[in-house]
Amino acid sequence: MPKVGMQPIRRQQLIEATLAAINDVGMHDASIVQIARRAGVSNGIISHYFRDKNGLLEATMRYLISHLGLAVKSRLLNLTENTPRARLRAIVQGNFDDSQTNSAAMKTWLAFWASSLHSPMLHRLQQVNDRRLYSNLSVEFSRCLPKDKARIAAKGVAGLIDGLWLRGALSHNVFNCEEALSITYDYIDQQLTHA
């Protein structure tokens, strides 16, 4: 009989083991056996909690997306000024948070993006995440720019976030957060000078 309260602990262990396995060997080679071994549980536990490897990958992506949301939210809540510039910078900072730019997270995001082209559930998660970023950026830009310009500026910032993040992920070096923030802040400032 399973111990009461173990489900959240086991799920977290398996998600962390999945991140570690993808970081070390890639998603394709991260087998259920290997992930279970890393988590110190039997293979059957993965089936019990997640159905299969796809279910575990989906849960892992939800975990990363949840941490992304928390990173953005905490920065927005800690702002001392409520200006569009400050709020846009907070959104960017959250997207470049260590929870999203550490090696395991970056490799898992890359695998997720590639897999989302072939998995309807992962594609839906990717679309929700994309829309949330675009919507948050659009709302802030629309506080001081006409709607059409706000949308274009939001696409530009989202493109910079994704592009800088992707270049960082593919470089095999530690992500240069300060450089990414500086480039993105400059773009935001350029857009806001037209307000």
UniProtKB/Swiss-Prot annotation:
Keywords: DNA-binding, Repressor, Transcription, Transcription regulation
Pathway: Amine and polyamine biosynthesis; betaine biosynthesis via choline pathway [regulation]
Superkingdom of source: Bacteria
Cross-referenced SUPFAM superfamilies: Homeodomain-like (SSF46689), Tetracyclin repressor-like, C-terminal domain (SSF48498)
PROSITE patterns (UniProt xref): HTH_TETR_1, HTH_TETR_2
HTH tetR-type domain boundaries: 8-68
Pfam families, per the entry: TetR_C_6 (PF13977), TetR_N (PF00440)
GO molecular function: DNA-binding transcription factor activity; transcription cis-regulatory region binding
DNA-binding region: 31-50
Gene Ontology BP, a term: glycine betaine biosynthetic process from choline
Function (record text): Repressor involved in the biosynthesis of the osmoprotectant glycine betaine. It represses transcription of the choline transporter BetT and the genes of BetAB involved in the synthesis of glycine betaine.
PANTHER family documented for this protein: HTH-TYPE TRANSCRIPTIONAL REGULATOR BETI, HTH-TYPE TRANSCRIPTIONAL REGULATOR RUTR
Protein name, per record: HTH-type transcriptional regulator BetI
Organism: Pectobacterium atrosepticum (strain SCRI 1043 / ATCC BAA-672) (Erwinia carotovora subsp. atroseptica)
Annotated gene: betI
